[in-house]
Structures are given as C-alpha cells and as structure tokens.
C-alpha cells in the first residue's frame, strides 16, 4: 500500500520534512516513489509547499495519507478539493 507521509531531512534540532509517496513497508527515511511537497515546522510561520496535481493524482490512485499529512492537507484545502472530485 502506498502512503503519503513525512520523511525527515534537515539537521539536529532543525527538522525539515519532505512529503513523499512511499510504500508503507519501507522505513521512514528509506526509499520513496515520489516527492509531493515540503514542510518546515520550525520557522515562525510554518512553511509548506505542495505539488497539488501530484497529490490529487496519488490520492485518486488509492494512496492513503498519514494523520499528520492529512492535517496538513486539510489546512491547505487540498483534502476538501479531493473530496469534491470524488462526488463528481
């Protein structure tokens, strides 16, 4: 099963995360299939960048977001957009 999840990068005490599509059996920082965004929580205003087209494609193909990634998608409005495409 493919999951959309966070992959930690950055240095000690300064985490940066990639939002990746990866096999659920691979380790957190292991192999991934595709990078769909970035998340920098340590900045004053949390900075996130998304490739919306890739994310919607992965979701439509059955990828499951983890809890944290789902919250990021909800805050950015991507999850609502995905839900409206399902109803059509």
UniProtKB/Swiss-Prot annotation:
<dbReference type="InterPro" id="IPR000307">
    <property type="entry name" value="Ribosomal_bS16"/>
</dbReference>
<comment type="similarity">
    <text>Belongs to the bacterial ribosomal protein bS16 family.</text>
</comment>
<dbReference type="GO" id="GO:0015935">
    <property type="term" value="C:small ribosomal subunit"/>
</dbReference>
<dbReference type="GO" id="GO:0003735">
    <property type="term" value="F:structural constituent of ribosome"/>
</dbReference>
<keyword id="KW-0687">Ribonucleoprotein</keyword>
<dbReference type="Pfam" id="PF00886">
    <property type="entry name" value="Ribosomal_S16"/>
</dbReference>
<protein>
    <recommendedName>
        <fullName>Small ribosomal subunit protein bS16</fullName>
    </recommendedName>
</protein>
<dbReference type="GO" id="GO:0006412">
    <property type="term" value="P:translation"/>
</dbReference>
<keyword id="KW-0689">Ribosomal protein</keyword>
<dbReference type="InterPro" id="IPR023803">
    <property type="entry name" value="Ribosomal_bS16_dom_sf"/>
</dbReference>
<dbReference type="GO" id="GO:0005737">
    <property type="term" value="C:cytoplasm"/>
</dbReference>
């Amino acid at each position: 099963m493919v999951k959309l999840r966070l992959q930690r990068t950055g240095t000690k005490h300064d985490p940066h995360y990639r939002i990746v599509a990866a096999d659920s059996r691979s380790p957190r920082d292991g192999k991934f299939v595709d990078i769909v965004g970035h998340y920098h929580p340590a900045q004053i205003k949390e900075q996130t960048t998304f490739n919306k087209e890739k994310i919607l494609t992965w979701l439509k193909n059955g990828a499951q977001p983890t809890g944290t990634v789902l919250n990021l998608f909800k805050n950015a409005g991507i999850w609502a957009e995905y839900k409206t495409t399902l109803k059509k």
